[in-house]
Amino acid sequence: MKRTYQPKKRHRSRVHGFRKRMSTSNGRQVLARRRQKGRKVLSA
């Protein structure tokens, strides 16, 4: 049985990346929350 996580840089950035987050209002809310919390990394 293969492992479920098969990392791909393109898929990671397209699904969870900064530009993807910025493209929707909810994504911008996510970034705002993470900035407020003081996260070092905002997105993938």
Curated annotation (Swiss-Prot):
- Provide ranges: composition bias, Basic residues: 1-22, 31-44
Return the PROSITE patterns for the record: RIBOSOMAL_L34 (PS00784)
Q: Which residues cross the membrane?
A: none
Q: Does Calcium show up as a keyword for this record?
A: no
One Gene Ontology cellular component annotation?
Answer: ribonucleoprotein complex
- Residues of the region (Disordered) are 1-44
Keyword tags: Ribonucleoprotein, Ribosomal protein
Q: What are the boundaries of the signal sequence? A: none
Which residues, by range, are in coiled-coil regions?
A: none
Specify the domain of life of the species encoding this protein: Bacteria
Molecular function per GO: structural constituent of ribosome
Q: Name one GO biological process term.
A: translation
> What family does this belong to?
Belongs to the bacterial ribosomal protein bL34 family.
Q: What is this protein called?
A: Large ribosomal subunit protein bL34
Q: Which organism is it from?
A: Levilactobacillus brevis (strain ATCC 367 / BCRC 12310 / CIP 105137 / JCM 1170 / LMG 11437 / NCIMB 947 / NCTC 947)
